[in-house]
Amino acid sequence: MKNIISLLACALIFSTVTMAQELKNLDFISPFHAEVAAVKKGGMWAFINMDGTLVIDYRDDLVMTNESGIACCEPDIARDYPFFESNRALIKEIKQGIAYYGYINSTGETVIEPEFINATNFHSNRAIVLKVFKETIGRNELLGKNVVSYSYNEEIINSDGETVAFLRGPFNLILDEKNLKTPPKIQSRFLGPNLISTKSENNTWEIQTINQK
């Protein structure tokens, strides 16, 4: 029994020392937002709580909101670090050379799979995303495969990833790495919890109210 207690004590001391080492030599520490702060070390990001405890370990898929092509928010509040809003933070996954965006919760669990070719941070439990759609338009019998086309819509999702409003689209999409080095721009922005402004093709703006869901 004494041996077990000693082993547990050693494990606790070791984990404490390890945690202290992990929080040294940091490259960047963000301000606190939603009671957590982002810390950067060696090109990877993690989150600490207000006690300085690492609550999400270092990972390489977190998205800085001023990243090129990402329409997170208004330029004056874009941040050069990841952050949480509405218990969601943006992540990125590269599939066949194309970046797809999704969200994790405050425990680091992926709650909305990376499936959007652009996405904003959440605002009052909602986010604006570019959602991809695939349509079979025929079949190439010679090659023995379906002929497909892709398009995307600009939509609003809730914190469960469900579409709650349609904004724009569909727009034709060439789904390959060369064409999507930079994601298509999101042309809408939040003015308030239920108010959205959207830029039209003639560079004017329209405002619409989004029903609560």
Regions found by a protein language model. Give the residues of each.
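Residue-level detector of conserved, function-critical positions
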Residues: 21-213
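N-terminal secretory signal peptides that target proteins for export/translocation
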Residues: 1-2
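Sec/Tat signal peptide C-region and signal peptidase I cleavage site
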Residues: 16-20
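Bacterial N-terminal signal peptides
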Residues: 6-15
